[in-house]
């Protein structure tokens, strides 16, 4: 983990497990955390990727979703509180 950024690997999780893990990270993210990088995978993670992007795009703590060059990762950029 680098300062301001948290990584969360949800490979092999189902939607419910991933949601529980992501929600826990969002709850515990302190003021110094501005980004959560969610590693969902690409080949077998497409359904999970789409679910995460659709579910968290309107989350109150998420300012925006960024898609990187690596299609197996989705970044949640957090709002300042």
Regions found by a protein language model. Name each.
Residues 1-81:
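Long, charged, low-complexity intrinsically disordered regions
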């Amino acid at each position: 983990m680098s300062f301001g950024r948290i990584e969360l690997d949800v490979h092999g999780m189902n939607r419910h497990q991933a949601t529980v893990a992501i929600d826990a990270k969002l709850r515990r993210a302190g003021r110094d955390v501005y980004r959560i990088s969610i590693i969902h995978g690409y080949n077998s993670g497409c359904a999970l990727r789409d679910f995460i992007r659709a579910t968290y795009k309107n989350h109150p703590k998420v300012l925006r979703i960024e898609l990187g060059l690596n299609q197996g990762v989705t970044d949640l950029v957090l709002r300042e509180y």
